[in-house]
């Protein structure tokens, strides 16, 4: 079964929504989010730079380590959100796991690079972070879904617009539970 353009676009919306929701909950401000493909990616979440103090190559101060952890969580969140969504679909393409891995290669490269500043036990650290991020996303799945739906209507959002969509999804979540 070939993945349709609609399926790929939905997967991208969930992928980018995962990044944005985790960034929001890790207090990492985002500049914007898009699911409009360009030469480099199918979508992206952009962040403001952390500041000149963020030099993981020069030290392991607590705030540097916290920033590494936050950005590792954010980097893992896209693939994990896409996976959670794909697992919930009644019909899956034959190669759906490979499609997710392929789409997340750039994210994973960045995550491994950041993790290597944190610890020499990168594999174990990332396995722990994946469990943490999956739990974080599952607890906030309505926000992920709400933002993914909003991105279907508005494929390019500023950080403020994305935050508003997350707040609206949170209100809806509380109203229906």
How would you describe each model-predicted region?
Residues 2-177:
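Soluble catalytic regions of large protease machineries
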